[in-house]
Amino acid sequence: MVSVILRSRNEERYVGFALQSLHDFFGYDLEIVLVDNESTDNTIRVVNSFEYLNIKKITINKNDYTPGKSLNLGLESCNGEIVLCMSSHCQITNLNLDKIQAKLKDNVAVWGKQIPIWDGKKVSRRYMWSNFKDVDQTNYFCELENRYFLHNAFCFYKREILIENLFDEKYSGKEDRYWVNDMINKGHQVYYDSEMICNHFYTDNGATWKGIG
């Protein structure tokens, strides 16, 4: 079974796309852990409408929130051997679980391609990060950031690895980059699967494409 950690904060606009795509690709053999950062909109109402899915809901205090703390909290409720960290404003469009499981035998994480979407329209390619390429890679190094790269908006992990190597809770963002650089420095590998694809709806201020979302 796969466990999914969804982080949310006022995601009424997109969380339904995320949940429907999870059901489309995994069916009912799925455990979803929603870690909600005190949403004030209809996020929880939308989530509750997916009553046929196995969804656990956890609330984290907005004044105590960091991405790493939210993910670590969600991990405590995960039972699957494989954990998918996914943004509540992402929608899976292509995924081969057999390939991902095979790659996780030699890699501690497998992350995928993101397509930026705004109001149902794809953003021009000039807005796309150079990091989401069309070729699979091991231990991808981002020249722009001058460090190894991985993105928690759409990334599979081995649960046992995450339990032993939690995300650093002090960072306000890019906890995934700090994690992957630490793991590679310890001798581990991570894999970028260019055929594992999601739509990533970016926020009003473009935060997703600044590395915040």
Predicted regions and their residues:
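A recurrent flexible, glycine/aromatic-enriched loop bordering the glycosyltransferase active site
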Residues: Q137-Y157
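Active-site donor/metal-binding and catalytic loop motifs
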Residues: Q189-G211
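Short aromatic/hydrophobic "clamp" motif used to bind/position activated sugar donors
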Residues: V83
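Glycine-rich, basic loop-to-helix element that forms the pyrophosphate-binding segment
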Residues: N61-C78
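A conserved acidic beta->alpha catalytic loop
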Residues: D36-R45, C90
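Short, acidic, metal-binding catalytic loop of nucleotide-sugar glycosyltransferases
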Residues: Q20-D29
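Conserved donor NDP-sugar-binding/catalytic core segment of glycosyltransferases
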Residues: L95-R125
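Acidic donor-binding loop at a coil-to-helix junction in glycosyltransferase catalytic cores
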Residues: S172-W179
